[in-house]
Amino acid sequence: MLAAWLAEAGWPRGHMDIATLEGYLIALLAWPVGVPAGAWLPPIWGGQGGWKVPAKIAAPDAYTKFAALVVGFMHDLDREISARPSRFEPMLSRTEVPSWDRSSLSGISWAQGFLRALQQNSQGLTWRTEGARIAVTRIAHLACLPATPPVSDLDVAADLKSAVSTLVAERATRGPLGALLVVD
């Protein structure tokens, strides 16, 4: 339902599609960036540094439904990346129509969403392990692939899954969802 809603017309320029949103939310969960409560929502609808809600979700019921779908998606992703073994499989943007637009290539939208989340905080890589730095560098590389990448969807998905797995193993919190749950 969320994927279809994000694919509809009427969103502001710069809003996220479902693959970009997944990458964005995974970054918030696997690499918590210390974003103030709720401040992570506006980038989803294309908000540029403010809380101006687009007409598409301006009605209170529509906004509540949108927020609930996004938070529900985030909870689903958290369950997938927290499971042992991990059940996370990256969603690649296969529904996009191929064009000259680089964001239509597999994994690029996802990786760009991940990087968009990281840009919300200036913590950088300074206190991260070498493995985490390498994982983020791999994701950044996918966001910048040339227009004709020599990699398959399966290779991109495997690389994203591996990078996320590395980051999840080191996370201290679940970002907007709070402290990690202790399971005995």
Region roles according to the model:
Residues 1-111, 115-184:
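Domain-length accessory/inserted modules outside core catalytic folds
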